[in-house]
């Protein structure tokens, strides 16, 4: 059966699958909780938001999945697929393709997904056109022992934005920059001294996720991290997690020494909905074997939306 949008008659299915969702967006899971929990699923019926869920019913099994795009982003994210007992179902790749096509209608150039490297969902994502562009590990740093370390961090101001963008270009590999765009807003925290440390902070009722950009030449990194955790604004006893991408893997020994707890390694995957070409047009992406990312510089982009 062809995948379709969720409707009100599907509410019993959502309730049945409420504990069987497989998250594909770690930050959203850790800050907001279960994507099919009572607090969040009604938002999928709001047509004003770029938040969409779909159903695929095949061979007596119903599959669910969700995708979201934050206002202003050039990419979308898969939120979840369900149920966890049907990750090898032959209809799952078609559902993922359908969700990606919806993101294309919003103007997204890419769709991202985060999945444990041993997950049974990995093959379905590959069949739906996703490829690995980075790896990451989520570290639980909630119980790192406090110390007398001073904060050393301040709220990012507009005057700090050029330094943050420069740090981004120094750390994020050029081939990944089309997928992970340059920070455009003065949010997060920066080191009070120098311009070698920045962290984006995502708050939610369930927890806080830190995404760092720390230059390898930064000094006293462990002390700076402890100071950050000791003085994190509006923490309110919520658990705190730190997301380490593969290009920042040198941070992991320091986190381990501090007492952080690592999650299983995750593949960060991307599906290209459009690629940029010199004719200043965006066309449907073709992905040659062995090539994950094809960045180009253009001054204007026109998007061919999915049919």
Task: Map each language-model feature to its residues.
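Conserved GNAT acetyl-CoA-binding A-motif
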Residues: 103-116, 235-246
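Short, structured motif recognition centered on aromatic/hydrophobic residues
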Residues: 52, 75-80, 96-100, 113, ...
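A structural feature that tracks compact, well-ordered secondary-structure segments
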Residues: 79-81, 98, 114-116, 124, ...
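Conserved acetyl-CoA-binding loop-helix of GNAT-fold acetyltransferases
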Residues: 87-103, 127, 218-232
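Amide-forming acyltransferase catalytic core, primarily the GNAT-like/NAT-type
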Residues: 1-62, 126-208
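Structural motif
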Residues: 6, 56-57, 65-68, 114-117, ...
